[in-house]
């Protein structure tokens, strides 16, 4: 998570929570003139289009006042979806036993991409079973993590 993403998460957690939603996480993707702020929300009863619209209005109001992003961007608010992104240790703990796809910031054993089942979470270390071997990953070295949907 970048410094800006950390700042945005801290800024938006309370307003999104006040609406009754969990701020699962967010991503700010810079793509030249077309940057995007993706905000993922969840609720115990699921997320519907109306929920995304309500959260989007609230987030837009906060962003207009605080103005933390200096470039033009599009705001996308959605549920985490089938390929749910994992941002916090609690997310990994919630999905112990599920398959996850990881992309690392710094390679481990000459690999940046890993896929396996989440075995356990111990503080800031996630253990994933990859091809029968238990591999430990520091959350600080995980650039991107998503659940792998089962069909």
UniProtKB/Swiss-Prot annotation:
Keyword Cell wall biogenesis/degradation in record: no
Name used for this protein in its record: Ribosome maturation factor RimP
One protein family per Pfam: RimP_N
GO biological processes: ribosomal small subunit assembly; translation
InterPro entries associated with the record: Ribosome_maturation_RimP, RimP_C, RimP_C_sf, RimP_N, RimP_N_sf
Annotated function: Required for maturation of 30S ribosomal subunits.
Family: Belongs to the RimP family.
Source organism per UniProt: Aliivibrio fischeri (strain MJ11)
NCBIfam families linked to this entry: PRK00092.1-1
Location in or out of the cell: Cytoplasm
Keywords, ordered alphabetically: Cytoplasm, Ribosome biogenesis
SUPFAM superfamilies tied to this protein: YhbC-like, C-terminal domain, YhbC-like, N-terminal domain
A GO CC annotation given for this chain: cytosol
């Amino acid at each position: 998570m970048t410094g800006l993403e950390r700042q945005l998460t801290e800024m938006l957690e309370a307003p999104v929570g006040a609406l009754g939603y969990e701020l699962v996480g967010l991503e700010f993707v810079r793509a030249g003139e077309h940057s995007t702020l993706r905000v993922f929300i969840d609720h115990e009863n699921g997320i519907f289009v109306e929920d995304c619209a309500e959260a989007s209005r609230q987030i837009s109001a906060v962003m207009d006042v605080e103005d933390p992003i200096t470039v033009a961007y599009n705001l996308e608010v959605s549920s985490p979806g089938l390929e749910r992104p994992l941002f916090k240790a609690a997310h990994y703990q919630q999905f112990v036993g599920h398959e996850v796809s990881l992309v690392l910031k710094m390679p481990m054993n000459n690999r940046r991409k890993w896929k396996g089942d989440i075995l356990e979470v111990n503080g800031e270390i996630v253990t994933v079973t990859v091809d029968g071997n238990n591999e430990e990953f520091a959350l600080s070295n995980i650039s991107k993590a998503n659940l792998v949907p089962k069909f």
